Structures are given as structure tokens and as C-alpha cells.
Amino acid sequence: MNKQKQYWTVGIILGIILIVLIIFWVRAANRNNTPQDPHAGHSIEETSAGQTTGTTPSSSAAGAQDSDALTSYLKEQDQIMTDMMDAMTVEPTGNASVDFLKGMIPHHESAIDMSLSYLKYGGENEELKQLAKDIIEAQTGEIDQMNQLIKEIGESGVKDEAKEEGYLAAYDEMMSSHAHMHHGTSTAKNVDEAFAEGMLMHHQMAVDMSKAILDYTDDEEVTKLAETIIAAQEKEIKQMDEILKQAK
């Protein structure tokens, strides 16, 4: 009987040992199967795709917005230029100075519109943003000045059809040379470059007009205005040209 109890005791002890061994074995197996890589569970394609593109949804959206802004700005700029060229058709008045002023007013108005459009579509270059604001302020003042000069010259009754003929010949040649500027020619990658590229050509047109009138006007105020336009806009042409070179 004692021997039988010993057998039962030994059997129970062996059973307990076996159970303990099974528990340790199960725990060890679970530890070995636990993923150590924080990226475990993600496919190779997902990981490599993220590393390769280096883009995020937010950056992709920003790029799309920039592209939309550029497209919209260029479309608006082309329309501004088309309207300007139509408005700059000058009917002879008998005075070259008046003809010059009547052509330069819509030219200035389009420069203001281009600057407002640039600011609206989110230009980021601080130097160009300040230039756009300066153009709006300066050329708004010059438009007021030109309207006053047209009134004063008209009241004086001064006519010189020979000089007017010479000026209009130069004016028509200048208009022909600038007739297709902007349309489908932009190589800009963003709104900043598009504005600088377009305004540079626009300024050159104003400089050409102003240089032309100097040969055909006897009006001191018109001469001063033309010289002011030449000096200011040639300086801004150099400024925009430098900005475009830095962007290359």
C-alpha cells in the first residue's frame, strides 16, 4: 500500500513538472514570434514607395495649387495684354504729346492690373511683391498726371501734325513689335517667374514709347514724364532680369 502511494506521489510530481515545462515552452515560443521591427506588418511595396517618392499628401496638394495658380495667372495676364493692345489704338489728335499720353494711360492701367493679379494669385518672392505694390502706387499717380496733361494741352489748342505723323509712325512700329508678347511664350515655373517675365516685357514697351516721344514733343511736362518713366522702368527691368537669372 505504501508502495502504491509512492507511485501516485511520483506520478503527480512528474505531471506537475510536465505542466510547468509546457508553460515555459509556450511562453518562449510566443516571445520568438513577437515582431521586433516597428514597421512589421507593412508591405515592402508600401515602405519602398514612401522612401522613393519622398512626398506627402500635403506636399502633393501644395504642388497642385501652385500649378493651378500659375495657369490662372497666365490666362489672366494674356487677357490683360489683349485688352491693353486694343485700348492702345490711338486716333490722331493733331498733337504727338496727347497721342503719347492717350496710349500710355491704358498701358499703365494694364501694369496695375498685372500687379494686382500677381498679388491675388499668391506670389511668394518678397522683392517682387514689393515691386508690384510700387508699380500700383507709382503708375496710379502717373495716370492722374497724364489725364491732367491731356486736359491742359487740349485747352492750349497746340497742334503739330508733322511731328504727330513722325511719332505715330514710330508708335505703330513699336506696337507691331510687341503685338504678340506673352501669348503662349511663357517658360515660367511659378507665379513669381511669370510676373517678372511678363512685366519685364511690359516695361520695355513703356520705355520704347517714352523714348519715341522725346523726339516729337515740345511739352516740358511730357518730356519730364517720359524721362521719369524711362529711368524708373529701366531700373526695374534690371531688377526683374536679375531675379529671373537667380531662379534659373
Task: Tell me the role of every PLM-derived stretch.
Residues 7-9, 20-30:
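Juxtamembrane cytosolic interface motif at the C-terminal end of transmembrane helices
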Residues 2-16:
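N-terminal Sec-pathway targeting helices
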Residues 25-248:
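All-alpha RGS (Regulator of G-protein Signaling) helical domain and cognate RGS-like helical scaffolds
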